[in-house]
Amino acid sequence: MIKAEQKVLKRFNKGCVDYHLLEDGDRILIALSGGKDSLELVRLLAQRARIFKPHIEVEAAHIIMDNIPYETDRSYLQDFCAENGIRLHILHSSFDESTDPRKTRCFLCAWNRRKTLFEFAVNNGFNKIALGHHMDDILVTLLMNITFEGSHSTMQPSLPLKHYPLTIVRPLCLVHEADIRQVAEELHFTKQKALCPYEETTRRSDMQAVFRQLEQLNPEARYSLWRSVFMA
């Protein structure tokens, strides 16, 4: 096992234990976008599902937005899941921009993706949805919320939903993006064919640069930021 794989596995296991993300009898649906993070989440949870305790069942769902002109390699995702012993569901969704012109395409797309995913999970007996956000995602969101909203908050490792009998879990919450990137390169994960043309990345990209600068100032900055939220 390569060093990056060992790091990712160790932090994945620690996150699952520290935040009680996996419990006996869980039926978990992975939101598979096709990016490196969700692919690695499929690989790790597939391995974890083969362990006797806690006994979990894992499947994945990939959502296609029919009215957004972007493309993912569906056959690759199907083959990847099959190789890992995971059943993949292909779901379709769309949205009508005219219903609320005040909302951006990205908001409407994300909202409808979540709704499609949640409803499928409930209707098919899943109790948890696993998302591929890693530690860097969570901390960049924290910095964005502090800077633009005045809110010391971010995505949680585990979050019960109010309107659905589901819990969102983020098993990669302690994993560093750099390690996932290295695993993806060494295991030859295939990237999406094309990204969404409407993706809003400027503000998040800017804050990612700020986060990198903080780590240059203090290599332990990520751990200080994490403690400020989750160990306060």
Segments from the language model and where they lie:
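Alpha-helical structural motif
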Residues: A4, V8, D73, H176, ...
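Residue-level detector of flexible, active-site-proximal loop/helix-junction positions
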Residues: M65-N67, F95-E97, L159, V175, ...
